[in-house]
């Protein structure tokens, strides 16, 4: 997407919009982007053995070049992307076939965009949670379903860290690691497509999560129409004031003109282009081995947010809920 032409980018955005519009108000979903430090054993290894010829010096130079490029590429950061969805149901028996249909539709929509995806089974989900609760990549995940009856432990025992500490208002601890949960306050009229990319390119352990709830279409249209009516009344009041003061009644406050235009465009998108209205909570959880490194990472993410007219706010006394 980043290197595509403008026409191709528009086509990709259109396809991605169709993916998002698939989710109606009964299907809340979230997009999770996890940057995790890999264990040393998982790092790339370059080994080109020497041979009995005159090119060993070239092989050695090539190996060093590859190692240098690997070191610069991601510094051991592994990047994962997840989409999680749910639906209301009376029980597992009712939910299972419906979830299966939604899963097939979502994977089909992603495939049309050229995105390969696969469903996670129970062990995969435990591995994801284990990685979140053991940042730094030092603790390997060891689990097998057959071990549960033998050990008497539950699944939570296999993924729980040594400790949680949420006593501080703006930070928390997971084992020996420091963490901070923040949310993104979106003040920009249009959110740049580069914001998320720049955050995820950082050399830091973090999790970006977008919790998304679709607003019912009829309710969304009714709400926007109500806002347009309110803006119309405000316009009338401003025009009355202008007439009484002897000013031109066509001169209105700039904010009022902007709000009126934005509301009309939003209503047109909902009614004519089959778009949907979403409620979004954008959270960022940073993790680091030291308090100072954590504050530096949060400051860097905050700088990226400010660059795109947004603000990163710390969740005061809500660190546990944010995590």
Question: Model-found features: residue ranges?
Answer:
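Extended, folded cores of ATP/NTP-driven motor/assembly subunits in large transport
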Residues: 1-323
């Amino acid at each position: 997407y980043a290197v595509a032409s403008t026409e191709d980018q528009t086509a990709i955005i259109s396809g991605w919009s169709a993916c998002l519009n698939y989710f109606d108000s009964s299907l809340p979903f979230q997009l999770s982007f996890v940057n995790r430090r890999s264990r040393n054993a998982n790092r790339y290894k370059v080994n080109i053995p020497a041979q009995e010829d005159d090119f060993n010096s070239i092989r050695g130079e090539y190996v060093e070049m590859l190692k240098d490029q690997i070191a610069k590429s991601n510094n051991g950061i592994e990047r994962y992307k997840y989409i999680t969805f749910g639906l209301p149901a009376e029980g597992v028996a009712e939910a299972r076939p419906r979830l299966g249909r939604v899963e097939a539709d979502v994977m089909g929509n992603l495939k049309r965009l050229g995105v390969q995806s696969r469903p996670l089974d129970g062990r995969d989900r435990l591995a994801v949670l284990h990685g979140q609760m053991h940042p730094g990549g030092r603790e390997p995940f060891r689990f097998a379903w057959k071990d549960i009856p033998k050990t008497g432990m539950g699944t939570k025992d296999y993924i729980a860290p040594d400790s949680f500490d949420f006593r501080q208002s703006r930070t928390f601890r997971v084992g020996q690691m420091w963490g901070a949960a923040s949310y993104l306050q979106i003040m920009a009229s249009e959110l740049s497509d580069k914001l998320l990319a720049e955050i995820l390119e950082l050399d830091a352990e973090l999790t970006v999560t977008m919790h998304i709830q679709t607003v019912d279409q009829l309710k969304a249209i009714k709400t926007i129409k109500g806002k347009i009516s309110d803006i119309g009344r405000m316009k009338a009041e401003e025009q009355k004031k202008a007439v009484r003061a002897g000013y031109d009644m066509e001169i209105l406050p700039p904010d009022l003109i902007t709000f009126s235009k934005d509301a009309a465009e939003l209503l047109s998108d909902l009614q004519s282009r089959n778009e949907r209205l979403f409620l979004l909570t954008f959270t960022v959880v940073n993790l680091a081995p030291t308090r100072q490194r954590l504050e530096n990472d949060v400051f860097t993410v905050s700088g990226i947010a400010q660059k795109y007219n947004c603000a990163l706010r710390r969740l005061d006394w809500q660190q546990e809920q944010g995590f």
